[in-house]
């Protein structure tokens, strides 16, 4: 009996998300007379449908109300259908999605979505509406090749500090702006607006051997995406954006897991185009550098100054990288305790890949997986290990989902 192949098959079934294995899922009984092995796979069925109505609070969205329906077995055919409505103090999300993960009874996924989102956080507001279509193929046991065609129409508005600070952009001074002290408020705040359409196609390759898509204990995930925007596709911006990500989950003991994630990306423009300001990289928050508020890790020079548009809006990076390290303790049932440290940064074009300049955070996290959610509730306390004068030394976050 090929035990490695058998266990791989069991974990692959678990990765579908319809079945949840127990901690010791396999029980073997050997029948020497008949030369047979009876195998019992222990676990329980996972709900296929999610219906949510409620209200809540997260650091990113503020107070919000939501209604959501999602099923991974639409009309009993194994299709995925979802509709989600969420409105809050700082963000709104409206999405409609459908996909067939086994189109024509083959390992082929076909899907489409339409969406409208807006977010008002940190120093910017962004409103996005668009649609996308997906075509994917299974290459091997854990490999997938997919293509995403996307259209996005974006309007954005960025704060500009017009007076009261060193480096006043209204006085013709456009080098990096010195960040204000935390206790000083801008005397006159204006805004700069940007809008544009992005049409893109993104081929991607992924490898995913994790034993559970929502709460993995072992396995790895690798993805390589290459987004082509503009050119013959149209739109207002011409660029290529490769992005790479790798995650690893290693069980250390029966109740502990070491988890590692590294990722990065970079823009390359062509046809004398430019990077849309609303797509430039910004880090911070529970999905990147925990302990620093959402979207506030922007490129800075050696003196801690931001890079600005000619009008005075702060610019994100044309490249980024991040590393996340976790040691997870399962306390019992759906509860996990996590120790973490995060590293990473964003860089402006003139800085290149300055790996000697990076941000560091560390902290603790409590995760609780409830039956009505497919992703864990997270209570995160992070410490900014090298804060700038305009930053807090720590941050508490509440969210739903995972960092990687």
For every predicted segment, state its role:
Residues 19-21, 49-51, 62, 74-81, ...:
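Repeated loop/turn-to-beta-strand initiation elements of outer-membrane beta-barrel proteins
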Residues 94-197, 203:
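Transmembrane beta-barrel wall of Gram-negative outer-membrane proteins
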Residues 71-73, 100-102, 137-139, 207-209, ...:
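Residue-level signature of outer-membrane beta-barrel architecture
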Residues 33-34, 57-64, 83-94, 119-126, ...:
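Solvent-exposed loop/turn segments connecting transmembrane beta-strands
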Residues 1-57, 68, 82-100, 240-245, ...:
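Periplasmic polypeptide-binding modules associated with outer-membrane biogenesis and secretion
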């Amino acid at each position: 009996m090929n035990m490695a192949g058998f266990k791989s098959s069991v974990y692959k079934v678990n990765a579908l998300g319809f079945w949840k294995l127990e901690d010791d899922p396999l029980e073997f009984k050997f029948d020497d007379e008949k030369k047979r092995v009876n195998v019992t796979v222990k676990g329980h069925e996972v709900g296929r449908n999610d219906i949510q109505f409620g209200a809540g609070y997260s650091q990113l969205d503020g107070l919000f109300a939501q209604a959501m329906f999602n099923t991974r077995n639409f009309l009993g055919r194994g299709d995925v259908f979802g509709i989600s409505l969420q409105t809050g103090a700082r963000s709104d999300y409206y999405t409609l999605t459908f996909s067939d993960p086994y189109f024509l009874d083959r390992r082929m996924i076909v899907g489409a979505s339409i969406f409208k989102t807006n977010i008002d956080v940190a120093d910017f507001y962004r409103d996005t509406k668009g649609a996308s279509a997906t075509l994917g193929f299974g290459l091997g046991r854990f490999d997938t090749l997919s293509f995403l065609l996307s259209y996005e129409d974006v309007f954005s508005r960025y704060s500009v500090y017009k007076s009261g600070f060193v480096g006043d952009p209204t006085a013709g001074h456009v080098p990096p702006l010195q960040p204000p002290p935390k206790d000083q408020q801008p005397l006159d705040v204006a805004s700069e607006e940007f809008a544009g359409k992005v049409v893109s196609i993104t081929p991607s390759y992924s490898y995913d051997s994790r034993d559970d898509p929502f709460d993995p204990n072992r396995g790895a995930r690798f993805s390589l995406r290459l987004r082509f925007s503009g050119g013959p596709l149209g739109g207002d911006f011409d660029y290529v954006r490769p992005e790479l990500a790798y995650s690893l989950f290693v069980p250390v003991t029966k109740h502990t897991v070491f988890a590692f994630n590294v990722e990065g990306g970079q823009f390359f423009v062509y046809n004398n185009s430019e990077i849309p300001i609303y797509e430039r990289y910004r880090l911070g928050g529970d999905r990147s550098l925990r302990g620093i508020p959402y979207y506030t890790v922007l490129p800075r020079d050696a003196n801690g100054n931001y890079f600005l548009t000619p009008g005075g809006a702060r610019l994100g990076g044309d490249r980024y990288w991040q590393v996340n390290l976790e040691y997870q303790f399962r306390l019992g049932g759906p509860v996990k305790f996590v120790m973490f440290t995060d590293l990473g940064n964003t860089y402006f074009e003139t800085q290149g890949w300055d790996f000697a300049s990076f941000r560091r955070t560390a902290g603790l996290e409590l995760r609780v997986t409830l039956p009505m959610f497919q992703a864990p509730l997270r209570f995160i306390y992070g410490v900014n290990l090298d804060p700038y004068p305009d930053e807090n030394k720590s941050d508490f976050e509440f969210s739903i989902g995972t960092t990687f």
